């Protein structure tokens, strides 16, 4: 089932894939990594001025990694703002997705966390480095094929 935004993207020749609607009726779209930044700018100009959240997950062991963006269109006098969910999939071998930091500044720490936990590199992010794990940490803890080390060095907090 194609939603209103999916139909609008088709009308304007913007490549995407409709993933239908979630349990709350929010339209979900899949965008290719190479198209994501330009389509993000279009959504911002169209009125999706608030990035509510960004997260990432490992689709399947040895499979793709996904970066998920929840956008909201906030307008004065509107009781129920429009929401949109975007999924961008990246290969496990070289997971690269354009950062949307320059579109929505609120994605700063969220893209860093996705990098830290899953190893997705967000191109043109101004401070892409680990945020939860030490810089010396090897591997990506939330990947399904991650093997946890047997030994954790406890560092002095002082």
From Swiss-Prot:
Which coarse location class applies to the principal site listed for this UniProt protein?
A: plastid
Q: Which GO terms describe its cellular component?
A: chloroplast thylakoid membrane
State which Enzyme Commission number(s) the record gives.
7.1.1.-
Q: Which reaction does it catalyse?
A: a plastoquinone + NADH + (n+1) H(+)(in) = a plastoquinol + NAD(+) + n H(+)(out); a plastoquinone + NADPH + (n+1) H(+)(in) = a plastoquinol + NADP(+) + n H(+)(out)
Q: Which Pfam families match?
A: Complex1_30kDa (PF00329)
Membrane-topology descriptor: Peripheral membrane protein
Location of the protein in the cell: Plastid, Chloroplast thylakoid membrane
- Cystine links in this protein are none
Q: Which keywords label this protein?
A: Chloroplast, Membrane, NAD, NADP, Plastid, Plastoquinone, Quinone, Thylakoid, Translocase, Transport
Spell out the molecular function terms from Gene Ontology.
NADH dehydrogenase (ubiquinone) activity; quinone binding
- GO BP: photosynthesis, light reaction
Enumerate the SUPFAM superfamilies for this protein.
Nqo5-like
PANTHER family with a match to the protein in the record: NADH DEHYDROGENASE [UBIQUINONE] IRON-SULFUR PROTEIN 3, MITOCHONDRIAL, NADH DEHYDROGENASE UBIQUINONE IRON-SULFUR PROTEIN 3
Protein role: NDH shuttles electrons from NAD(P)H:plastoquinone, via FMN and iron-sulfur (Fe-S) centers, to quinones in the photosynthetic chain and possibly in a chloroplast respiratory chain. The immediate electron acceptor for the enzyme in this species is believed to be plastoquinone. Couples the redox reaction to proton translocation, and thus conserves the redox energy in a proton gradient.
Q: What quaternary arrangement does the UniProt entry report?
A: NDH is composed of at least 16 different subunits, 5 of which are encoded in the nucleus.
The entry's family comment says:
Belongs to the complex I 30 kDa subunit family.
Know the name of this protein? NAD(P)H-quinone oxidoreductase subunit J, chloroplastic
Q: Which organism is it from?
A: Solanum lycopersicum (Tomato)
């Amino acid at each position: 089932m194609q939603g209103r935004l999916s139909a609008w993207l088709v009308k304007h020749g913007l490549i995407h894939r409709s993933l239908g609607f979630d349990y709350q009726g929010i339209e979900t779209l899949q965008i290719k990594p190479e198209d994501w930044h330009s389509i993000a700018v279009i959504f911002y100009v169209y009125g999706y001025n608030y990035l509510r959240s960004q997260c990432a997950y490992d689709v399947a062991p040895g499979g793709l990694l996904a970066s998920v963006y929840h956008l909201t269109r906030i307008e004065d006098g509107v009781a129920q703002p429009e929401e949109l969910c975007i999924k961008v999939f990246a290969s496990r071998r070289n997971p690269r997705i354009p950062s949307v930091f320059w579109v929505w500044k609120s994605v700063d720490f969220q893209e860093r966390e996705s990098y830290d936990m899953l190893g997705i590199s967000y191109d043109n992010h101004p401070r892409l480095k680990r945020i939860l794990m030490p810089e010396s940490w090897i591997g990506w803890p939330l990947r399904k094929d991650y093997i946890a080390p047997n030994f954790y060095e406890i560092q002095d907090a002082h």
